[in-house]
């Protein structure tokens, strides 16, 4: 009788552990993106299919999605000699930095950011939408179309977990 109880207890424990493991693996889209992401590459894809590195070399940066619906993003390109100054408040490299609040579209795997302030002032008080591709520790964030001196482009950020 004790043997039967031991087997029944073991089977119940095994099922409980399996159910807990399955629940832990089934994260929502929002839960999966929360936290810091290191930016490993950035490129802009123009309407004609051309891909450009408008940064002049490798970038460094991070985007963070907080549990409370807040986000920050900063991308810093390589230093440019002509941008150097003695004022530490003036960057000597291309910089894109902004922050604000965000919501998610679970079904569409999209992040909708409401930019509150930015290093490029016309971006303040605008909406930015990223479609997210990939899973796990590596993602690609595809931004909403923008315009620059070369035309309309879609920014793409490749990110990984730290």
Put a short name on every predicted segment:
Residues 1-11:
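Bacterial N-terminal signal peptides that target proteins for export
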Residues 12, 20-162:
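Lipid interaction determinants
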């Amino acid at each position: 009788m004790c043997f039967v109880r031991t087997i029944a207890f073991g089977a119940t424990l095994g099922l409980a552990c399996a159910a807990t493991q399955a629940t832990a693996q089934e994260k929502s889209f929002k839960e999966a993106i929360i936290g810091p992401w290191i930016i490993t590459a950035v490129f802009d894809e123009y309407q004609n299919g051309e891909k450009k590195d408008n940064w002049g070399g490798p970038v460094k940066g991070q985007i963070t999605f907080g549990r409370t619906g807040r986000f920050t993003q900063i991308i810093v390109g390589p230093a440019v000699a002509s941008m150097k100054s003695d004022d530490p408040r003036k960057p000597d490299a291309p910089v894109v930095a902004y922050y604000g609040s965000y919501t998610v579209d679970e079904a569409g795997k999209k992040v909708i950011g409401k930019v509150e302030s930015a290093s490029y002032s016309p971006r303040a008080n605008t909406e930015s939408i990223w479609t997210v591709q990939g899973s796990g520790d590596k993602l690609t964030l595809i931004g909403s179309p923008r315009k620059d001196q070369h035309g309309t482009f879609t920014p793409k950020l490749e990110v990984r977990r730290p």
